[in-house]
Amino acid sequence: MIRLFTFAIITVFLIVISRLALQRAYKYIKLNKKINNTESKTRLSIRLVSTVPYYLPLFEGLQNFGQYVLPDYPVAAIPLYKKIILPMLIFYMNHAILGLVTFFALYYVLVRNKSPIPVHQLVRFNSMQSILLFLVGSLFGAVFRAFPIEFRISFLGLMVCNMMFWFVLSTITYSIVKAVQGKYSNIPVISEAVRIQISGYST
């Protein structure tokens, strides 16, 4: 009798879980179909607005990794970095509250379902993705800073720093290019998490 009761509970539990999984999969497929149908119709102004939120993970990546490795690159882009990007980066670093304010502004104004303004799906997607990239960059930066200073200035430490910087830069560049094209980027894990997050939202 006890075994039968236990089996019945497990069966009901599996049925409920399966139903929830199917509902989630249906929403995900429906969202992807909707996304594919609207990609080619996105206006240029919306595409450009979709790239703006990526300044947040970019500056976070420059703060955590870029400022340590970029000055050693003997390329023509370094003067451009020092004259244009570095002053903005210093301003960002000196006003730590700016990143936090931008983070909450992106979420409450552009990502949230009850946004005070109508938001295009492409803008919402890229805003959410920039938030996740910002969080990933912040986490990597915190972990890297947790290591002893001897490791961080060593050859291996600079290699790790270099790798993290190029990971952040490449994902942001890829996302911006896709946004300008009016398409949705597909970064493993991160883009999937974004699609799941906005799957219940209306455009």
UniProtKB/Swiss-Prot annotation:
Entry-linked PANTHER family: PROTEIN TIC 20-II, CHLOROPLASTIC (PTHR33510:SF5)
Family, per entry: Belongs to the Tic20 family.
Subcellular location: Plastid, Chloroplast membrane
Main subcellular localisation: plastid
Gene Ontology CC terms: chloroplast membrane
Protein source organism: Pyropia yezoensis (Susabi-nori)
Transmembrane segments: 2-22, 51-71, 84-104, 131-151, 153-173
InterPro entries cross-referenced by the UniProt entry: Tic20 (IPR005691)
Keyword Transmembrane helix tagged: yes
Superkingdom of the organism of origin: Eukaryota
Keywords (A to Z) from UniProt: Chloroplast, Membrane, Plastid, Transmembrane, Transmembrane helix
Name this protein carries in UniProt: Tic20 family protein Ycf60
Bilayer disposition of the protein: Multi-pass membrane protein
